[in-house]
Amino acid sequence: MNILNGGAHAESNVDVQEFMVVPHGFQSFSEALRAGVEIYHSLKTNLKQEGLLGGVGDEGGFAPNLSRNEEGLRLVREAIEVAGYAPGKEVSIALDVAAQEFFDGSNYLIDGELISGTNLGRKYSDWLDEYPIVSIEDPFGEDDWDSWKEFTSREGHRVQIVGDDLYVTNPKRLEKGISIQASNAILIKLNQIGTFTETMEVIRKSKEAGFGTIISHRSGETSDDI
C-alpha cells in the first residue's frame, strides 16, 4: 500500500518515488487492509503534527517536503507504531526508489549530494540496518548493471531487490540480469513488452531463475479482466 510519494509522482523534494507498507502478519486480507488504512491515517496525523502535511502524490500517498529521504522511512515506521502494529513483525516497508529519475549516467543526485552507485548502495544498507524494509524496487539506474550486481550480491539474502525499469519485461534484459545476478525479483508489466507471449516467456524465465515475480498494476488500466 502506497502511503508516501516523492520523485516523479509528487511535487515535493523527496527523491524516492514510493514508500509503501506491507501488512504481512495477519490471518486475512481484510485484517491486512484494515492495518494499511489505519497506518495511512496515522501517517496523516503525524505529518499534520509536524507541520509537514501538504499535497497528495499521483499514487495516492502523502507528498510532504522532507529534509532527507530517510525522514520518510522514519515517518512511515512511526505511523506503523502509532497505529498499534509491530514494525517488521506485522507490517514492513517497501520502497520504489525509481533511481533512474536522479541518475545522470554516472552518479546519483540524492539528498542534494552527487554520489556513486557504490555509495548509494551503502546508503541502502544503512537503511536496511535501521528500518524494517523487505523490498527495494529500482534502487539503481536501468543501465547501471555493476551497481545492481554489487548490491544484490551483498544484500540479496535479506531484502527483495526488484527490477522494473531495469528489465521493462524484456526477455533479453532479463537474461542478462539472471546471468550476472543483478536482482532477485522482477516486476511484470504486460504493456511494456506488448504481447502475452513475450510476457509469459519473461515470467517463465524469471521463475526458473528463482526470482520473485510480481505482477504490476498500471496507472491507466481499465476494469477489464484482460
Task: Please describe what each predicted stretch is.
Residues 2-57:
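Mobile "lid/hinge" segments at catalytic clefts and subdomain interfaces of large enzymes
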Residues 8-9, 62-63, 196, 222:
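Gly/Ser/Thr-rich beta-alpha loop segments that engage phosphate groups in nucleotides
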Residues 11-12, 65-66, 199:
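Basic, gly/Ser/Thr/Pro-rich low-complexity segments located predominantly at protein N termini
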Residues 18-29, 53-69, 98-111:
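Active-site-proximal beta-alpha loop/turn segments in soluble metabolic enzymes
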Residues 70-226:
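Catalytic core of soluble alpha/beta enzymes
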